[in-house]
Amino acid sequence: MSENTSTATQPTPLLQDTFTVGSRTFSSRLLVGTGKYKDMTETGAAIGASAAEIVTVAIRRTNIGQNSNEPNLLDVISPDKYTILPNTAGCFDAETAIRTCKLARELLGGHNLVKLEVLGDEKTLYPNVMETLKAAKVLIDDGFEVMVYTSDDPIVAQELESMGCVAIMPLGSLIGSGLGLINRHTLSLIIENTKVPVLVDAGVGTASDAAIAMELGCDGVLMNSAIANAKNPVMMAQAMKHAVWAGRQAFLAGRMPMRKMATASSPQTGYFFQ
């Protein structure tokens, strides 16, 4: 969705560079997950270091009040400080995903912003597009603001947008793979043809992947494994914060044209010795 405003007459101060998802506006374009950390302390420290404002939580795998006998993640990630984004990780059909979103809304006191993901199989965790479309329609009709994990197919992205999804979240590569952005061309097509925010979801492995996503014009990047599986998750969270910031600034600045041949940087006239 991002518009390149990289002109001298229309500067965009980065500190005012917000983006809107549904009815909410955010400053940080880095979204983070809560899984795979060694304990709650590390979870809180890494998320704090990331400066993320949106934190996604797998409702089927994380206790946010369902079980009073287990530690509650919300004691570490307070809804007063962060926007909690419930997700439907682990759902393989529309019905289960819909039910999970309704449970999240109940647990979070009417919260209606959700991340929909309906998976195709356990080996690839690739999105099941047909079930995703089915679930998205029901959830939108029920008043949810749906951010949707999907394939990098521009036509599917257009369909999800036309249904009313508030953000399109194509995968960069397989969930947890760390392979980076495999198909930048189709991601660019989605960005160019989508009016709602586009956020890369899945596949980011290191800071350069996040920067590239932002340089392409993505509105944000969501990640979990890249931070949680790093040797030093807190340091990696800081690196990702800076990478997303730098990539966004580079996009707004506008990169130089790519050329096949060399172009001298120094003047071609006025040499001291001729």
UniProtKB/Swiss-Prot annotation:
Top EC class for this record: transferase
Annotated CDD domains: ThiG (cd04728)
Catalytic reaction equation(s): [ThiS sulfur-carrier protein]-C-terminal-Gly-aminoethanethioate + 2-iminoacetate + 1-deoxy-D-xylulose 5-phosphate = [ThiS sulfur-carrier protein]-C-terminal Gly-Gly + 2-[(2R,5Z)-2-carboxy-4-methylthiazol-5(2H)-ylidene]ethyl phosphate + 2 H2O + H(+)
A Pfam family reported for this protein in Swiss-Prot or TrEMBL: ThiG
Localisation: Cytoplasm
Main subcellular location of this protein, as a coarse class: cytoplasm
Positions that bind 1-deoxy-D-xylulose 5-phosphate: 176, 202-203, 224-225
Oligomer status and interactors: Homotetramer. Forms heterodimers with either ThiH or ThiS.
Identification of the protein by name: Thiazole synthase
Species assigned in the record: Psychrobacter arcticus (strain DSM 17307 / VKM B-2377 / 273-4)
The gene coding this protein: thiG
